[in-house]
Every structure is written in structure tokens, then in C-alpha cells.
Amino acid sequence: MLHVCGMPYAPILAPSLLAGDHANLAASARTVSEAGVSWLHLDLMDGHFVPNLTFGPETLAALRRAGCQLFFDTHLMLSEPQRYIEAFAKAGANLISIHIEPTYDHEVTLARIRALGCQCGIVLNPGTPAEAISHLVDQVDLVLVMTVQPGFGGQPFRRDMLTKISQIDQWRRERGLKYRLEVDGGIDLATAAECRAAGTDTFVAGTSFFKSANRREFAGTISQMQ
């Protein structure tokens, strides 16, 4: 399989475009680059799996046309992600993560993402136990643990997810796997430190990043976490 990184896992910040300026997404993406960050997290919502609507493949394509060269960490919060992965891959996604909760063939969809030239990830909502993805972790490049209920930004961090994070981190150590372990929801410098201690290496931050007085310093603090 294609691994995103090797051990040890250096921390990565993936600012969420959902918290950017929706009237000028390209400018928000440039803000990420100017902070010295290489990843951009894109939340794609269909209004069915989660009660909100956000971006589509054309958003990714438009950002690429505008010259954005960031690594697109693409999170599909869709009831039928298998219908759209090709469109997102063609639009410029680098990594496509899908949720375990909807009913579809997860293994086939992950393999299809890989066949399209993208890295693949699996996502769990707060109410979904880690065991639900145990059979898939050897097939992915990233596991994303939601630390809020997905759908809207700005929610408070759920500390009860730290145990789940630790369990998924333990699996990769015990099984010799190299997937990245990402968290999304209520992430600021304090909660990122808690997640780092539990085994997280990839941090989605929206409001806390874009509203930071010094985004470069914010990003640097994340990248230097031990």
C-alpha cells in the first residue's frame, strides 16, 4: 500500500477551508500557504449524511486553476461517496477520506480511490466505535477521528474521543501499519496538544487557525509538537 509517511509521525496542520472566506476561497487558500502550511482540508457535505451543504468538485478545480498547489485533504461527508470519488480525483484531490457509517462497499471504494491516483482515508463519527474500522486500517493511508459531530464548524472539542484516538494509534503500532491519524473538530493549540499526547499526528483546524493573530506562529506550534 502507499503510505503517507513513515515513523516517527511528524505533526501536520491541515487548515479547514470551511472556516475561510467563502466569498474568496482562493485568498483563504493563499493564507494557508503564506503560513508555511502544505495541507488544506476540504469538507464536502451533501445535506443528507450531514445537515449542511458546502463545496463540490468544481471548488477544488477552481482552486487548482487559481494556482493552488496545496495538498488537498478531501473529506467526503456524503451518503453515497462512491458516486463522486472520480469527480473529486479529477478535480485535484490528493487524499480522499470516506465515512464508515453509510452503507456501501467501503473496501471497493477505498480501492477505487487508490486506482484513481489518490491516497485514501476512513472516517469515524464520535458515536462510531473504533472497532467499526478495524478491518480496514491496513487498506488506508489515513484514519480521521471526528472530535465533534460533523456538519458545522466551531463546535467544542469532545475529550471523550481521546480514548478512541489512543486505541487507533495502538493498532498501527501493534500491527506495524503506517497510516496517519487525523483529528477534526474543536482543534486549537490546547486540544491539539491533548490529541498529540494520545497519538494524533494530523490536525484539522478551522476557526482557530483563520482567526489566529499570527497564523504562521500557530502552524509552527503545531509542527513542533513532540
Placement of each model-derived feature along the sequence:
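C-terminal helical cap(s) of enzyme catalytic domains, especially alpha/beta-barrels
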Residues: 196, 210-226
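A structural motif
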Residues: 34-39, 93, 140, 200
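Active-site beta-loop-alpha junctions enriched in small/polar residues
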Residues: 16-20, 45-47, 77-81, 101-103, ...
